[in-house]
C-alpha cells in the first residue's frame, strides 16, 4: 500500500490522483498486450532468473520492443526495468482508494504559514510590513513561473549574454539552429542548459538579483508555490530586458511573483495575498498555459470570461485594452492572439472530446485551463468588499501548450523551446512593460 498526502484542496487532488491511476491502467494494458502477443513473457522470466542478463535497451529489444520504445521504457524506469515490466505483466490495475482527512483545516494552516513568510520577506526587503506600505508603493501580483519574470528583470543577463552565446556556439547548442524573432528568447532558452553545466553561474545570477532587489523564497510551507519579491526602486536605470523599458527613478512599486497554483488551491493563494497587501494592490496578472480549442501550439489566449466546468457558472472578465492585445500581437511574430471564454476544469487530462466540442461551438470557448475561475472569483469578491481597489488592473493571458481536440494530440508532448519560449516571454514582456510604465507614470503624476 501507499500513503499519499494531499497538499491542495479537495477535488483537485482527487481528480489528479484518479486520472493518474486511469492513465497508468491504460498504458499498462498496452504494454501487457504487447508482451502477450509476442510471447515475450517466458523471455522476461528467463531474463529475470539470469545473473548475466542484458540490461537497458538491449533487454527491451529482446522482449520485442522497437528501438524508440526501448529507449522510452528505459527513460521511465532507468533502474530495474525488467522488474517493473514483470510487475505490469502480473498486476491487473485493481486499486482501492481510502481517503481519510485527519485535519479539516490542514491546507488553510499551510496557506497561513506561507502568507506569513511573504509578509516577513516584504519586511526584510522594504523595511515595512505589507499593511504599512505608503500610497506611492504599489503592489503588482503576478502568477507565472519561477524564471521568466526574474530573467527579464535581472541585469546579470545583459552582462553575461555574450558569454552564454559563446558557450552555446562552442557546443553547437540545438537552440542556435532555430530562427528566433527575438535574440533574447534564445538567450533565456540556452541559459537553462548553461546553468546545469556552470553551477557557479546560477549562484551568481541569484546574487546579482539580490543586489538589485530580487528576493526568492524557497520555503513553500508545503504549498509547492515559490515566491519572488522584486523591488523596482532598486532596478532604477538597470539594464533589464530590452523590450520592457527602463525603470524610472521615482518608481517604488514592488512585484510579488508566485509560481503556478493548481485548481482550487489558486483561490486560497490569491485571497491571502489580496488580504495581505489590500489597497496597495495595483494589478493582478496571470500568465498561464492552457489547452486550446482552436489555433496552434505557441499561440496566446486572452480570455473574455471564465466558465466553471463543474457548475457552468459564466463569469465575464473586464475587457482588455486594445493596446495590450496589439502589443502582444506585435511581440508574437508567427503566432496569433485568440480572445473568447475559457473553460476552468478540475483536471485537463482525460477530457471528453465530445464535451469540449460542445463548449467550443455552443459557448465559443477558446481554451481549457484549471485556475482562472478560482482566481477571478476571489479578485471579484475582494474588489466588491473593498479589500482591493476597483481600479486595480486585471491581466489574464495563456500560451497554448497542447490541442486536446486534435485527433493525434498528446497532452504529455513536450513543447520544444522554439514553440514555448517565444509566447511565454511575449506575455512576460507585455505584462512587465505595462507594470513598469504604470509605476513610472504613477510617480510622475503623484
Show where each model-derived region lies:
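Accessory terminal and edge-of-domain segments that mediate assembly/interaction
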Residues: 1-446
Amino acid at each position: 500500500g501507499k500513503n499519499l498526502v494531499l497538499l491542495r484542496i479537495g477535488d483537485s487532488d482527487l481528480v489528479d490522483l484518479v486520472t493518474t491511476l486511469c492513465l497508468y491502467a491504460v498504458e499498462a494494458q498496452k504494454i501487457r498486450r504487447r508482451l502477450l502477443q509476442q510471447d515475450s513473457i517466458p523471455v522476461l522470466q528467463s531474463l529475470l532468473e539470469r545473473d548475466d542478463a542484458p540490461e537497458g535497451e538491449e533487454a527491451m529489444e529482446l522482449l520485442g520492443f522497437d528501438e524508440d520504445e526501448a529507449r522510452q521504457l528505459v527513460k521511465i524506469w532507468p533502474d530495474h526495468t525488467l522488474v517493473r515490466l514483470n510487475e505490469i505483466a502480473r498486476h491487473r490495475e485493481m486499486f482501492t482508494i481510502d481517503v481519510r482527512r485527519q485535519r479539516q483545516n490542514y491546507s488553510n494552516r499551510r496557506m497561513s504559514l506561507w502568507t506569513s513568510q511573504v509578509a516577513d520577506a516584504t519586511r526584510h526587503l522594504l523595511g515595512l510590513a505589507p499593511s504599512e506600505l505608503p500610497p506611492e508603493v504599489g503592489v503588482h501580483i503576478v502568477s507565472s513561473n519561477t524564471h521568466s519574470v526574474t530573467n527579464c528583470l535581472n541585469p546579470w543577463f545583459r552582462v553575461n549574454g555574450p558569454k552564454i552565446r559563446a558557450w552555446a556556439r562552442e557546443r553547437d547548442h540545438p537552440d542556435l539552429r532555430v530562427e528566433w524573432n527575438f535574440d533574447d528568447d534564445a538567450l533565456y532558452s540556452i541559459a537553462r542548459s548553461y546553468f546545469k553545466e556552470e553551477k557557479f553561474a546560477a549562484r551568481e545570477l541569484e546574487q546579482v538579483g539580490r543586489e538589485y532587489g530580487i528576493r526568492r523564497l524557497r520555503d513553500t510551507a508545503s504549498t509547492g508555490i515559490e515566491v519572488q519579491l522584486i523591488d523596482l526602486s532598486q532596478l532604477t536605470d538597470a539594464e533589464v530586458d530590452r523590450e520592457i523599458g527602463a525603470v524610472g527613478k521615482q518608481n517604488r512599486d514592488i512585484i510579488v511573483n508566485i509560481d503556478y497554483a493548481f485548481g482550487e488551491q489558486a483561490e486560497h493563494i490569491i485571497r491571502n495575498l489580496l488580504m495581505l497587501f489590500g489597497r496597495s494592490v495595483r494589478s493582478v496578472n496571470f500568465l498561464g498555459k492552457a489547452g486550446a480549442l482552436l489555433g496552434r501550439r505557441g499561440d496566446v489566449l486572452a480570455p473574455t470570461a471564465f466558465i466553471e466546468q463543474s457548475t457552468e457558472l459564466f463569469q465575464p472578465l473586464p475587457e482588455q485594452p486594445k493596446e495590450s492585445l496589439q502589443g502582444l500581437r506585435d511581440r508574437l511574430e508567427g503566432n496569433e492572439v485568440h480572445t473568447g471564454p475559457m473553460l476552468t476544469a478540475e483536471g485537463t487530462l482525460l477530457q471528453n472530446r465530445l464535451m469540449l466540442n460542445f463548449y467550443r461551438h455552443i459557448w465559443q470557448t477558446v481554451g481549457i485551463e484549471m485556475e482562472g475561475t478560482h482566481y477571478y472569483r476571489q479578485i471579484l469578491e475582494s474588489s466588491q468588499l473593498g479589500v482591493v481597489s476597483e481600479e486595480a488592473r486585471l491581466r489574464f493571458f495563456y500560451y497554448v501548450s497542447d490541442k486536446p481536440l486534435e485527433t493525434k494530440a498528446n497532452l504529455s508532448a513536450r513543447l520544444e523551446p522554439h514553440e514555448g519560449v517565444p509566447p511565454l516571454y511575449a506575455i512576460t514582456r507585455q505584462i512587465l512593460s505595462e507594470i513598469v510604465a504604470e509605476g513610472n507614470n504613477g510617480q510622475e503624476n503623484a
